Amino acid sequence: MIIKDYSEAKKIFLHYNGSYFHMQREEYLEQYMKFNISKKEERKWLKEKVEKILSTISEVKNINLKYDKYWNILYILTETLEDNHLLDKTISAFEKDLKYLDIFSINMILEMIHDNKKIWKNFKKKLKKIIQNNDISKNEIISKEQNKLKGTQFLTEDKVIKKYREILSKLQS
C-alpha cells in the first residue's frame, strides 16, 4: 500500500528514532510498514531530525534537557543511522557544552559512544583530545535536574566519579 501523505508514517518513524524494535514493541510496526517507506527516505528523515536537534541544542540551558537531546541524537547515530559527518558535528557541539554538563551526563554520553565499537574506534582520539583540553573539575557531579530523575536517587557522587574514571581509562587505552 503506497500512501501519498507520509506525515503519519514520518511521525511514527521519528517518534521511535527509526527503531523497528521499539515500533514492534509498542505495536506500531505493522501500521508503519503499510506506508512502504524506502530506506533512503528513512535516512533522510533521521538526518533532518538530528540536524534540527543540533541546531537548537546550544539554546538549551537545563542540563537534563540538554542530556536528553544528546541521548536522542546519539541513539539515532549509534543504533540506526551511523553517519560520521553528523556524529562529528554532534561531538563538536558536545565539546562546546562540556562546561555546562554534569559529570554524570558527560559519562553517559561517552558510554553511549563507547558501546558502538566502530564509532568508538573512529572518534576515540577526538574524544580524548576534547576531554584533555577541557577542565571539568568545577562541573557538578550530579546536577539537581539529573538527581530528580527516577533511578538516579541511588547514585552517589563516588559511583559517578568511579564510572567516569573507567570511561577515561578506556579513552587512554
What residue ranges belong to the model's regions?
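Charged, low-complexity interaction regions
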Residues: Y20-F21, N62-N64, Y100, I136-I142, ...
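Amphipathic alpha-helical elements of HEAT/ARM-like alpha-solenoid repeat scaffolds that form extended
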Residues: I12, H22-I37, K66-T80, D102-N116, ...
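Eukaryotic acidic, Ser/Thr-rich intrinsically disordered low-complexity regions
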Residues: N139-S169, S173
